[in-house]
Amino acid sequence: MHILMYRWKAYNYRDIEQTFLLLGHTVDNIEQELGSYDVSPEFERVIEEKIRGTHYDMVFTVNYFPLISNVCERTGVKYISWTCDNPLISMYHESVFHACNYIFTFDKTNYLEFRGMGVKHIWYLPLAVDTERMDALLGAPEEAGRWKAAQDPEMRKY
């Protein structure tokens, strides 16, 4: 698959992009500061030109962006978002009903709420982590105790 990934200041893009690449997908990134998640004619133009200029199988974002959903709906490209924040105010937008959307949320109550409102393309998906990267950061298993504050009797009193 050829994936266009909109990157902003979310912490988990590196792990997600690495996983896409390991699965054999191609990833192009686009970054731009947004003043509004709902309306940004300049950014909509930029992303629409990018989509129309290159074949993408999907657009992916961490968290949901109504303006990206609107562009994907217009261009007929699938929009996949995976939320890592709650409440995610940007989801309370009429665009969540677009057929292009595939919304994944880590919060089961959020999933149930939007499913109850009639959003068809929403699923519950817990957050994930690149365990190999975390293992490398934490060191050998015998050193893992260094990172567990709860094991320290002094820390338990807090």
Predicted regions and their residues:
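Catalytic core of nucleotide-activated saccharide and alditol-phosphate transferases
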Residues: 80-158
